[in-house]
C-alpha cells in the first residue's frame, strides 16, 4: 500500500507553528515510508478565507522546504463533486433533507439544555413523509447510525470510542447549496486516496462523524493520528503574548528554517536523547508511536540555542543566502566590504539570529557618522592618541593585508609602547567600528579593509584632538 498523507490548512490567517508542526509530521511520515504528501487548501469558509492567507501558507511551506507531491487542491473548486456525492447519498437514503426552521431548532436546543441534555437534532425530518415543494429551503443531513459505536485506533493516543447515540445527524449541505467542512474533508480524503490523517487533537471529535460518512460511502477509512496542542512556557495555549506564532515571523526575526524545523520536530517527538537532527535524520527516524500524547511547551530560549547552533554549523555560504534578506531589510549596501559568507564566519559566534547579525554589521560596509558615546568617553581619550598613531602607521606599512599581519601590527604596537594589548586594542576597536564591542580585533580590522581602517583611525584622532581643545 502506498502511504499518502496530507496537510489541509484553512486559509484564514498565517501558517502558525502548530500548523507547521502538523505539516512537518505529515511530511516526515510520508517521506519515511516512501509515500506522497498532499497540500489541500480547505477554503470553504468563504467569509474568512483570503488570498493573502493562502499566499502566507505557501510562503511558510516553501521557506521550510516542505515540498508537496500533489496540490495545492482547493475545496472551493470541488463543489460540484461534493454535491454530486450528496445527491447520490440522498438517492441511497444515507442522507435526507431537513426543513426545520431556525426557530424550531433553537427552541429544541433550549428545551434540551433546560433538561440537562446535550443539544442535538431530534431527527424529525429523518422520519417525516411530508411533501415539500422543490424550491422550499432546506439543508441536507447525514443519517448517522443510531446504534452501536465508532472505534478507531489513534496512532498516537490508542483506541478511541464514540457512541453513535452521542453523534448528531450532521448537516452536510447548507440551505445555500454549499457543502459543509466535515463532509468536504471526507470526500477529499476519499478521492485523494489519503491513507493516514495526521492532524491536531482539536479534530478528534470530527473523526467519528467522518468515519461514519466514509462507511456510508463504502469508502476506505484512513488511519488517524491526533497531535497534542502546543502551549506557551506558562502552560497556557500558545498565543501572540508568548512571542511569535507565525512561521514567517520567525523568518523575519532572523531564524533559519533548519532551526525551526529541528525545534518543531522535537516539540512532542523524540529519538533517544538526540537534540540536533538533520532533515535526513528526521525522515529516517520519525515514527508516530514516538509522538507524545501530552501537550508540549514552546520554549523560545531552546529555539534560540538551536538557531545559534545552525548559524555556525551550516555552510557559511548557505547561511549567507538567508542573511541577504535581512541585510536588504536594513538597507545596507554590501558592495564595499566582506562577502556575506565571510561575515557569517566573523559574527556567527556573537549573533544568535540573522536579524541581530544584519543589525550589527553595518560598520563593515558603511562609515558611521559618530562614535558610540559611552565607548568614546571611555576609550578615545588623550592617552589613546599615541597607541592609535603608532598602530595606524604599522597598519599602513602592511603590504600583505591578512588578519595575521594585522594581529602582528597590534601586538608590535603594544610591545613598542610597553603597554598591555587592551591599551591598544580598545581604542582601535572603537576607532574602526564606532562601538566598544566586535569580533576579534584582527579579523575585524582585516575585514573592514586597510584604507577604511586607517581613515577611521584618523577620524578617531581628530575626535581626541577636538576633545582636548574643548577642555
Swiss-Prot record:
Zn(2+) binds at residues 98, 100, 125, 127. InterPro entries: aa-tRNA-synth_I_cd-bd (IPR045462), aa-tRNA-synth_I_codon-bd_sub2 (IPR020751), aa-tRNA-synth_I_CS (IPR001412), aa_tRNA-synth_I_cd-bd_sf (IPR008925), Glu-tRNA-ligase_bac/mito (IPR004527), Glu/Gln-tRNA-synth (IPR000924), Glu/Gln-tRNA-synth_Ib_cat-dom (IPR020058), GluQ/Sye (IPR049940). Keywords: Aminoacyl-tRNA synthetase, ATP-binding, Cytoplasm, Ligase, Metal-binding, Nucleotide-binding, Protein biosynthesis, Zinc. A motif ('HIGH' region) lies at residues 9-19. ATP binds at residue 240. A motif ('KMSKS' region) lies at residues 237-241. Binds 1 zinc ion per subunit. It is an enzyme of class 6 (ligase). It catalyses: tRNA(Glu) + L-glutamate + ATP = L-glutamyl-tRNA(Glu) + AMP + diphosphate. It is found in: Cytoplasm. GO terms for cellular component: cytosol. Its main location: cytoplasm. GO terms for biological process: glutamyl-tRNA aminoacylation. The keyword Secreted does not apply. One of its GO terms (molecular function) is tRNA binding. Belongs to the class-I aminoacyl-tRNA synthetase family. Glutamate--tRNA ligase type 1 subfamily. Monomer. HAMAP family: Glu_tRNA_synth_type1. Catalyzes the attachment of glutamate to tRNA(Glu) in a two-step reaction: glutamate is first activated by ATP to form Glu-AMP and then transferred to the acceptor end of tRNA(Glu). This is Glutamate--tRNA ligase. It comes from Shigella sonnei (strain Ss046). The lineage of its organism: Bacteria, Pseudomonadati, Pseudomonadota, Gammaproteobacteria, Enterobacterales. The gene is gltX.
Amino acid at each position: 500500500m502506498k502511504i499518502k498523507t496530507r496537510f489541509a490548512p484553512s486559509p484564514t490567517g498565517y501558517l502558525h507553528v502548530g500548523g507547521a508542526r502538523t505539516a512537518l509530521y505529515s511530511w516526515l511520515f510520508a517521506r519515511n515510508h516512501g509515500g506522497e504528501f498532499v497540500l489541500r487548501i480547505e477554503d470553504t469558509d468563504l467569509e474568512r478565507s483570503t488570498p493573502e492567507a493562502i499566499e502566507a501558507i505557501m510562503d511558510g511551506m516553501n521557506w521550510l522546504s516542505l515540498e508537496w507531491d500533489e496540490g495545492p487542491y482547493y475545496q472551493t473548486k470541488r463543489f460540484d463533486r461534493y454535491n454530486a456525492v450528496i445527491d447520490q447519498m440522498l438517492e441511497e437514503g444515507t442522507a435526507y433533507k431537513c426543513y426545520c426552521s431556525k426557530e424550531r431548532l433553537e427552541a429544541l436546543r433550549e428545551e434540551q439544555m433546560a433538561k440537562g441534555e446535550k443539544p442535538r437534532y431530534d431527527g424529525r425530518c429523518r422520519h417525516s413523509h411530508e411533501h415539500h415543494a422543490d424550491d422550499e429551503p432546506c439543508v441536507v443531513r447525514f443519517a448517522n447510525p443510531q446504534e452501536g459505536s465508532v472505534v478507531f485506533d489513534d496512532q498516537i493516543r490508542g483506541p478511541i470510542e464514540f457512541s453513535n447515540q452521542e453523534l448528531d445527524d450532521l448537516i452536510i449541505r447548507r440551505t445555500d447549496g454549499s457543502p459543509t467542512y466535515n463532509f468536504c474533508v471526507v470526500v477529499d480524503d476519499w478521492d485523494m486516496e489519503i491513507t493516514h490523517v495526521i492532524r491536531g487533537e482539536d479534530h478528534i471529535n470530527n473523526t467519528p462523524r467522518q468515519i461514519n460518512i466514509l462507511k456510508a460511502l463504502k469508502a476506505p477509512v484512513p488511519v488517524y493520528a491526533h497531535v497534542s496542542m502546543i502551549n506557551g512556557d506558562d502552560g497556557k495555549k500558545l498565543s501572540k503574548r508568548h512571542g511569535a506564532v507565525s512561521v514567517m515571523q520567525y523568518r523575519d526575526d532572523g531564524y533559519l528554517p533548519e532551526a525551526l524545523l529541528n525545534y518543531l520536530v522535537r516539540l512532542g517527538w523524540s529519538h533517544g536523547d538526540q537534540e540536533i537532527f538533520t532533515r535526513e535524520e528526521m525522515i529516517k527516524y520519525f515514527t508516530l508511536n514516538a509522538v507524545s500524547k501530552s501537550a508540549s511547551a514552546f520554549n523560545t530560549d531552546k529555539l534560540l540555542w538551536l538557531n545559534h547552533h545552525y548559524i555556525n554549523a551550516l555552510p557559511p555560504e548557505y547561511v549567507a543566502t538567508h542573511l541577504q534578506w535581512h541585510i536588504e531589510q536594513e538597507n545596507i549596501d554590501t558592495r564595499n566590504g566582506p562577502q556575506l559568507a565571510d561575515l557569517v564566519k566573523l559574527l556567527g559566534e556573537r549573533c544568535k539570529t540573522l536579524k541581530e547579525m544584519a543589525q550589527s554589521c553595518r560598520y563593515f560596509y558603511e562609515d558611521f557618522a559618530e562614535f558610540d558615546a559611552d565607548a568614546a568617553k571611555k576609550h578615545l581619550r588623550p592617552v589613546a592618541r599615541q597607541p592609535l598613531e603608532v598602530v595606524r602607521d604599522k597598519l599602513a606599512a602592511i603590504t600583505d593585508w591578512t588578519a595575521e599581519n594585522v594581529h602582528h601590527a597590534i601586538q608590535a604596537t603594544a610591545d613598542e609602547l610597553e603597554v598591555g594589548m587592551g591599551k591598544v586594542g580598545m581604542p582601535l576597536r572603537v576607532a574602526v567600528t564606532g562601538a566598544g564591542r566586535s569580533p576579534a580585533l584582527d579579523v575585524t580590522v582585516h575585514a573592514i579593509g586597510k584604507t577604511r581602517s586607517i581613515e577611521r583611525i584618523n577620524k578617531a584622532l581628530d575626535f581626541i584632538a577636538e576633545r582636548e581643545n574643548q577642555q
